[in-house]
Amino acid sequence: LFGGQGITLHSRERPIPSNFTGVVQSYIENPLLVEGKKAHMRLYLIFLSYRPLQAYFWKNGIVRFAPEAYLPKKGWLSNSAIHITNTALNQNHSNIKLLDNSEIEDDGSIWGLTPYVNRISANRGESDQIWDRLYQTASGFVNLLREKGFFSETSSIPNNALIPKIIGFDALLDSDKKVWFLEIQRNPGQTGKGPVNKINGSLYRELFKLTFDTIERKMMDKRTTEF
């Protein structure tokens, strides 16, 4: 489903064909709305090594909004612009607003995750709670990857070898601000409109910083040992 291709919505009344091949997910009927619109979050994990497993949750990300207001009514399932928040699918919609100014992270159809969390939080305490839930989701995601053997292909990698990698995953907040995991992005997109390039630029700078800090620390440990 790269780029949102193949996404469709169906009611329970419509049976799934026996020869169907694909992924079926339950629909979250009470998504958290901002200015009446549904959104999803793109979150990131930075992996530095696999043996031992060393991963970091990046405290920022990208939020994408559906172009039309979330107003349940008869026949609304057929209108993907209400439900689908994928920018690639909605890029030609008249309501999509993609800003040229990358410094603006709280306007248009794409936001930064930090201003989004601030917007939906009543106070600092609630903001911290949401970030904690996002972190717990990321931690659970890493454990799921481990349980499903995602890292088994790295068994031939020497211990302590640095293999920097960014993995993205999408999540959604419901009206109770509960986090719902949606999908994994093994090779998340790096460029885009609005604040995407600025945010992803910061992400990769963080990746390089963590990588080189780790290399420097290893070299320092080696020099200290040899001394």
Where do the model's predicted regions map?
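Glycine-rich phosphate/pyrophosphate-binding beta-alpha loops
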Residues: Q185-G194
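Catalytic core of tubulin tyrosine ligase-like
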Residues: L1-I166, D174-W180, G194-F227
